[in-house]
Design a protein with these regions (language model features):
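Bacterial Sec-pathway N-terminal export signals of envelope proteins
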Residues: 17-88, 253, 257-287, 364
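A short glycine-centered flexible hinge/capping loop motif at secondary-structure junctions
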Residues: 200-204, 406-410, 447
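Periplasmic alpha-helical coiled-coil/stalk elements that build and connect Gram-negative outer-membrane
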Residues: 17, 136, 145, 151-268, ...
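Acidic, low-complexity, intrinsically disordered peripheral segments
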Residues: 246-248, 260, 429-453
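Hydrophobic, lipid-facing positions within transmembrane beta-strands of outer-membrane proteins
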Residues: 120-126, 268, 326-332
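Sec-dependent signal peptide recognition
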Residues: 2-9
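Small/polar (Gly/Ser/Thr/Ala-rich) solvent-exposed segments
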Residues: 74, 94-117, 127-156, 160, ...
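C-terminal motif of bacterial Sec signal peptides marking the signal peptidase cleavage site
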Residues: 13-15
Length: 453
């Protein structure tokens, strides 16, 4: 009766092994099944090709140098290398285990040290577990998906670091362009100051005009110091990204390129998310955990292994080589007797899988929001640039009128300088918007992942 119950238990568990844990078949979770096992070999080339829309060779060169020298990327590549080695190691588990040994033993007397006996022995042992239920294959697939997830993590790191490097590059370019405007205004104020001082000595201008022009010069110099400090901070951050290599001053002296609209693909449907490395990594991690769940279940099933032993033992070396013995042994193990010990492990595996499902859904939802937010940001900045551009035209005309009125003595120097200051503030505001526009476009382009357009 006990034997019948045992056999029945085996069949019940074998049947359960083919019932995989249920999964929510929502639209978002179904994306995880579409993730590719083929990871792009040269993601840096795809990223650099996407940067061509900015028509900035210095930017492309900088990003390429960051890819070559950044320590975080080097560390990520080492993690990927480690994952590949672990996967190759796990594949070997599907092969038979082979071991061999050679022994020589001698027995001698303690006092007389004469030889009592000598024994030679050798053996070869081959052990192979037959993967009846696919447990070893599931473990191998789990390790493969972990390797794929690590590869996608590496690509995601490349996108993040590329965006960060571009951000610092444009910050430095923006500051250089703004400094150029301040230096131009400083030259104008210096010329105005010389004129005011000569007219003050001649009694034409009052001391108030002298104080006004000196105060304006001090404000400009203060703004220059502030921008130079910001530039130094951005330079230091960029130097860290480059790992202090290829410190070309060309990057630090670049100016913001002239504004031009960027033509990009604005498609942000859910299918495009499959090109995002962070989404692909989350999907691969989920699939890895799924295979882990299956393999944990299958640990409860019987295992069947074959063992082949070839050995020989004799006092003569020639006998060891000429008269070996072989043994063939089969073994069936019933690990399901440890059900109560394994039960918690199964529950933990299920809970982890549910956690990874939630992580995947959250990443997909966040990615959708990012694409929409970046697209909205681009549209808002574009409209703002048009508005500021119109304002600049009006202020330039106003400044020309006020200059004529100041020279005619109709308005004070303070009023004229205020109009001039307003124009240059708006000009720097325009440059800031252009910088924000380029960076918003870059974020949108990289948020679309590594799709090749």
């Amino acid at each position: 009766m006990k034997i019948k119950a045992l056999i029945l238990s085996v069949f019940i568990i074998c049947g359960c092994s083919h019932v995989k844990p249920t999964q929510n078949n929502s639209t978002i979770l179904s994306l995880a099944d579409s993730v590719s096992t083929t990871v792009k070999k040269n993601p840096e080339l795809v990223i650099l090709s996407k940067l061509r829309v900015f028509d900035d060779k210095q930017l492309s060169r900088l990003i390429n140098n960051v890819f070559l020298n950044n320590n975080d990327l080097i560390k990520a590549s080492l993690r990927l290398k480690e994952a590949k080695i672990l996967y190759e190691q796990e594949k070997l588990a599907l092969l038979p285990d082979l071991s061999s040994q050679i022994d020589l033993s001698e027995t001698r007397g303690v006092k007389r040290r004469e030889l009592q006996s000598r024994t030679f022995s050798s053996g070869i042992n081959i052990n192979y577990e037959i993967d009846l239920w696919g447990k070893l294959s599931d473990v191998n697939d789990q390790q493969q998906w972990e390797m794929i997830a690590t590869a996608y993590d590496y690509q995601a790191s490349m996108l993040t670091i590329a965006a960060t490097a571009a951000k610092y590059y444009w910050e430095i370019s923006l500051i250089n362009s703004q400094l150029e405007n301040y230096y131009k205004r400083k030259q104008i104020i210096s010329a105005t100051k010389c004129l005011v001082m000569s007219e003050f000595k001649a009694g034409v201008k009052s001391e108030l005009d002298v104080l006004t022009v000196n105060e304006t010069m001090s404000d400009i110099q203060s703004s220059i110091y502030s921008l130079e400090k910001q530039k130094e901070l951005s330079k230091n951050a960029l130097v860290v990204l480059l790992n202090r290599k290829d410190l070309n001053n060309v990057f630090f002296e670049s100016k913001l390129v002239e504004y031009k609209p960027i033509e990009i693909n604005n498609d942000s449907d859910i299918s495009s998310l499959l090109f995002r490395p962070d989404v692909q990594s989350a999907a691969a991690t989920l699939k890895s955990q799924s295979y882990n769940t299956y393999s944990v279940w299958k640990e409860m099933l019987p295992t069947f292994s074959l063992n082949f032993i070839l050995n020989s033992s004799s006092s003569l070396l020639s006998e060891v080589l000429n008269n070996p013995l072989n043994t063939v042994r089969s073994e069936i193990a019933f690990p399901f007797f440890s059900w109560f010990k394994k039960n918690k492990k199964i529950e933990i595996s299920r809970v982890k899988k549910e956690q990874y499902e939630i992580d995947f859904v959250n990443i997909v939802n966040r990615s959708i929001n990012e694409l929409r937010d970046f697209n909205a940001e681009i549209n808002a900045i574009s409209k703002n640039i048009e508005s500021i551009n119109d304002k600049l035209k009006n202020q330039k005309h106003e400044m020309a009128i006020n200059r004529s009125m100041y020279e005619a003595g109709c308005i004070s120097l303070k009023s004229y300088l205020a109009t001039q200051e307003k124009y240059y503030i708006t000009k720097n505001e325009f440059l800031q918007s252009v910088c924000d526009y380029y960076y918003a476009n870059l974020k949108f382009i990289l948020a679309q992942g590594l799709n090749e357009e």
